[in-house]
Amino acid sequence: MVTLFLRQGENGKQVLLSFPATTPAEKADVAATMESLKSMSKTVTIQGAASEVMNLGKYLHGVDLAAEGEVERIDQLAERLEHMSEVDCDKFAGMLDANSISGTKDILRLTERLDDYVILPGCGSAQSMGKYLVGCGAFPVPEKLIGYINYEAVGIEFCDAHGGAACSRGYVVRKEGLPQAVLDDLHTSKQTYEMML
């Protein structure tokens, strides 16, 4: 579910509106609320949002819900988010931060690309990223040099080359172009996790 914090005009009434609107009663409520807000002002802007994707409000802020097609796009977005797992919601938050977003169309397009991204677990800093890369073999180092590695520099170089953004579970990055050792490690980790369930 996505709950929007809306404002009528610049200084008008503030309203909460939740999506997706799936039942006829919910759809009628959304339509009535929007008609009421639009009757006194041409704009109904999103001031914030509450959802499982923690940073979604940042990307929806300022969107004029009274504009053509915006209510439908928000409803479609909320529907897609409702079907995402908690892990996918965290991944999607990182995907939003890692991409250039300029409206609801971009956000909707990005929901279709979840499988193009991975989370590098526990990588919340350049230092932890470097340790992960060395540990999984993506950055091979002779055993006798392990104590001399500048993990932060390794992590920074990786981030510069691959982009991405942090999320609550690690670092979100596109799969395309990742070292095979990283992909293999993620695959092995996923299998181990599934066996433990």
Report the location of each language-model feature:
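Conserved aromatic
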Residues: 20-24, 120, 148
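Mixed-charge (acidic/basic) macromolecular-recognition segments
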Residues: 29-141, 145, 176, 185, ...
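Long, highly charged low-complexity segments enriched in Glu/Asp and Lys/Arg with interspersed Ser/Thr
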Residues: 156-190
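Acidic, low-complexity, intrinsically disordered interaction modules
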Residues: 142-156
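Non-Sec secretion/translocation targeting segments of pathogen effectors
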Residues: 150, 190-197
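N-terminal ordered "arm"
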Residues: 1-44
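Short amphipathic beta-strand/extended segments with alternating polar/hydrophobic composition
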Residues: 16-20, 58, 183-185
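Short, surface-exposed beta-strand/loop "edge" segments at domain boundaries and coil↔beta transitions
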Residues: 11-16, 53, 178-182
